Amino acid sequence: MSSRNPIQLLDTITINQIAAGEVIENSISVVKELVENALDAGADEIEVETLGGGQGLIVVKDNGCGMSSEDVALALKRHATSKIGEFSDVFSLSSFGFRGEALPAIASISKMEILSCPRAGEGSRTIIHGGEIVTSEAKPRQVGTTISIDSLFYNVPVRRGFQKSPQTDRMAMRKLLENRILSVENVGWSWVSERQQEFHIFKHQGFAERVAFVMGEGFMQEALRVDKGGNLVRVVGFLGSPGFHRPTRLGQRVFINDRPVDSTFISKKISEAYSMLLPPQRYPVFVLKLYLPPEWCDFNVHPQKTEVRILREEFVGEFLSETIGEVLARPQEVSVFETASTLPALRFFDEQLPESALEGLQGSNVLPVVKLTPSSSGSLPFLDREPDPLPVDRQTQISWGASQEVRFLTSLGKIVLAEDSEGVHAIFTESARKHLFYLSLVENHQHNYKSQSFLVPLCLEVTPQERIFLSSHIEEFKLLGIEISQMGPCVFSIESAPTFIGEEELKLWILSLAAESAKVDKRAMTLLIKEALTQTIFCKTLRAFDISWLSLLWQLGKPEKAFDGSQIRRLVLDEDFIKE
């Protein structure tokens, strides 16, 4: 029988490091907690500075009430808070934080410096390494607090290894701060990233100005104002017009009692109101602030406090549906411009390929069916090629791999029966055709896209978050034949693009990629850009690609690039299919 370690109490540092695993996921979590502390301290000017997406350095400076050296030492202890006194206070919160876990958790996994001064007292400087106070001394400062975080996760290297790229964190950081700009008015915000000023919002700037800054002038030009409710329930904000929509829900900002939340329930209710007004697979864009009685909201669901339980959810849902429906039903001026998503050339973006179209299309070692080199006209050579002849000798044998022989039996419409040492296989020729065509595009067009220069460069206006994506991937787009240059803070010029994609669909395609960029790191995004362009060619030119089943069998059976068993089964159907 194995021996068991005795039960013992964990030390404070270990407890805080474990808590940090829940509360502090990355540098964005650190900034979120420090900014919320600043707001709870009554600050109306908050400055944030980051390096390496926050992984190198984080500095949050505020003009709040400040702390004495004694308060600083107490704040570094777990569950020390000024926000609540008993559990019932959780259901009537007027502050952003309340657990008292964040500061000690951050201190336990970083090198921290706190410089603070209360309104009636002297300033102090406290240095903490891994949760232990190293130095505490008097230091003059104006009223307020500055917290600097260096070497995040330095003593938990496993956590550090799971961090995303600085670029990904930088984009997430921007969204976090944008949400604070929108949710808390009468507060000035400043963010310096990589030693460059990202933005400076003055505290006197109103809600509409802030929405225009975050969502872009294009959104505000046709935005619909929302303001309805009374003392019990109220919703204010802006809805995007039905002509302003996005391929994902990333353009949706929801706040409950000035707290940014991820609410599938609210998003669904609003999307239902738009359901008959948007193209398929498109989502409305909006900024909405919902105010509910504090006792109706339970934010104590997740350490990040982005989830919320609503006590009278059905009532709130009906209120939102009715309000959004009324706003959308108001008479609106009709735009004389046709939106990009309604252009006939873009309808393929709304059509979902069947799963069989891409089944088994990646990870294969099949040689290309035909060398695809764009001609001077920009067309592909197989567009004018006659299909291969269909007749074939019944006893034709084809190598299926390094040591297998495949013998053709017969064809049944779209299915070819072939036999090898394992038995009879039914090959679904349409899936195989798409498979081979896609692989040809991947291998032959990775660095060979025919481009055209625009007589007048296209102007693309983007949001600040989309700007970060574009400015970081200019070289990747250039390799694909898309020349992009930055003309202003949120304005880009597209000077050339592949011949097979139109001007308006090019803009939509780029913005769709920008929406996806928040989900992956930079390396994965580079691959996604290349794959997305390949799939665009795939959608546009697949119908013109023809191949006989004999040629198809020959391609699948090339011995120098043989399939293994798992790859074969992506393209062949088993005996159950034949019986049907």
UniProtKB/Swiss-Prot annotation:
GO CC term (a single one): mismatch repair complex
Protein known as: DNA mismatch repair protein MutL
Presence of keyword DNA damage: yes
GO terms of molecular function: ATP binding; ATP hydrolysis activity; ATP-dependent DNA damage sensor activity; mismatched DNA binding
Protein species of origin: Chlamydia caviae (strain ATCC VR-813 / DSM 19441 / 03DC25 / GPIC) (Chlamydophila caviae)
Any single biological process term in GO: mismatch repair
Coiled-coil annotated spans: none
Family indicated by similarity: Belongs to the DNA mismatch repair MutL/HexB family.
Any Pfam family hit: MutL_C
Record's function text: This protein is involved in the repair of mismatches in DNA. It is required for dam-dependent methyl-directed DNA mismatch repair. May act as a 'molecular matchmaker', a protein that promotes the formation of a stable complex between two or more DNA-binding proteins in an ATP-dependent manner without itself being part of a final effector complex.
Alphabetic keyword roster: DNA damage, DNA repair
PROSITE patterns: DNA_MISMATCH_REPAIR_1 (PS00058)
